[in-house]
Amino acid sequence: MNELQKRIKSFGYAFQGIAKLIKKEHNAWIHCAAIVLVTLAGFHFGITPTEWCIVTLCFGMVLAAEGFNTAIERLVDLVSPNYHPIAGDVKDIAAGAVLICAIAAGIIGIIVFLPYLLNC
């Protein structure tokens, strides 16, 4: 297998990971629903290219955080199938990181969309 084939195969694994995240994680569904709603709002209000860049970065940040959180939770479950306080802390901290990203994205959404909403 040459280098190009290896790279293509690694992208395939990455896309499988995204599909697993979206198929199996309830919170990822919620984030995807928010992405759809924000995208529709962006088209409706005609946000600027810069604003599209900002909200797209937020989409990626939140979904990536959810992916990291899911991977961490599954790894913790694998190595510590029985309850352990440190394992619980690790999972809580990872979930908290997702919440931080989601709150930041929400604040950015307010900053971007509030002027449009006030001008309706």
Report the location of each language-model feature.
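Hydrophobic alpha-helical transmembrane segments
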Residues: 2-71, 79, 83-86, 95-120
